Amino acid sequence: MPRTARGIYHNLKESEYVVSNGDATFFFFSEMYQNKFLDGYQKHREEFNKKINRITDTPLNMDMLADITFYSNVEKRGFHAWLKGVNTTWQEIHVYALRTMTKPCTQNWSRIRKPKLVERRKSMV
């Protein structure tokens, strides 16, 4: 189903509103939600880390887990994500976040054009 007159997609898989950090890619129903995510993820990371540090002082990098949480708070109508060009489930992206906690930093998010199928296949190799 194409985009509505107000620029909203009814199917996340067709959406052109896409952000990526190089490994993970999130899809949004509208440009408003995409902008809300891009404008707020840094602040949410800080707040998320403060909450975790109140409970326990951890050397782990919780940024990706914070970003997934923020995405699910912002995009209320569904969840569609890719990991390295492959469709992924909510559980799989959380496992990925747990694996990246030992990396010293998490890449920032940026808008990207939705990759075509040929480009996705290249990134999977």
Curated annotation (Swiss-Prot):
It comes from the Viruses. Residues 77-96 bind DNA. The keyword Transferase applies. One of its GO terms (cellular component) is DNA-directed RNA polymerase complex. Disulfide bonds: none annotated. The keyword Hydrolase does not apply. GO terms for molecular function: DNA-directed RNA polymerase activity; sigma factor activity. Keywords: Activator, DNA-directed RNA polymerase, Early protein, Nucleotidyltransferase, Sigma factor, Transcription, Transcription regulation, Transferase. Belongs to the podoviruses GP4 family. This protein is believed to be a positive regulator of late transcription. It may function as a sigma-like component of the host RNA polymerase. Binds to a region of the A3 promoter located between nucleotides -50 and -100 relative to the transcription start site, that presents a sequence-directed curvature. Full induction of this curvature is needed for the transcription activation process. This is Late genes activator. It comes from Bacillus phage Nf. The gene is 4.
